[in-house]
Amino acid sequence: DTIENVKDDDSVNTILRSRKNSSIYKGLEYTKNNLDTGFVSAGNTAALMVLSRLHMGMISEIDRPAICSLIPNKKNYSLMLDLGANLTVNGNNLLQFAIMGYCYFSILNKKTKPKIGILNIGTENNKGLEFLQEGADLISKSFLNEYFTGFIEPNNVTSGECDIIISDGYTGNIMLKSAEGISNF
C-alpha cells in the first residue's frame, strides 16, 4: 500500500526523505527485487530519474540515466534519447547515450547496423555547440563509428535516415513536445 504522493513541485530532497511510501518509490523498489518486471510511470520525471538511479543503480561506465522513446518515422521508428533527464550534458554523456541507445535498439530490433545521429541545427561537421562537436568526435572514435552518420536536423527526425537519435535532454524534450503539439494541430 502507498499512502504518499510525489507532487510535481517536490524537490529531490523531499522525494528522497519524505516520499518513501509513494507509488513511484515502492514500485521501483519492487522492480529492483523482481527483475522480471518493468515499471511505467506518468508521474514526476525528476522523482522517476532520482529514484530509478537509487533503486536500480547505473550500468558500469554510464554516468547518467536518459529518457528515451520510440519516435515514428517514414520507415518504422527511431529511438531518441535523451528526452528530458539531463538538461546540460557534455560530449562524453552523448557518447554514453549513444551506447545505451545502441544496446536498447539492438534488443528491440534485430537490425545489425543501426544508423546513429546527433540532433543538431545542421548536418555540417562544423555546426553546433561545443558539446555536440565533442560528442560527435567521441562517437567517431568509439566502436560506434561504423554506425555513426553524423548530425541530423530536426526536420529529418521522422525521415527514417537515423535509427537512433542522440540529444541533450533540453533539446530532446523541446523536440518531443513540439512534435506532440504539431500532431494535435
Predicted feature descriptions by range:
Residues D1-D36:
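Phosphate/nucleotide-donor binding subsite
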Residues K26-Y30, L51, N93-I107, E134, ...:
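Alpha-helical scaffold segments in soluble metabolic enzymes
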Residues N21-L28, K32, G38-S52, D63-C68, ...:
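Short glycine/serine/threonine-rich phosphate/pyrophosphate-binding segments
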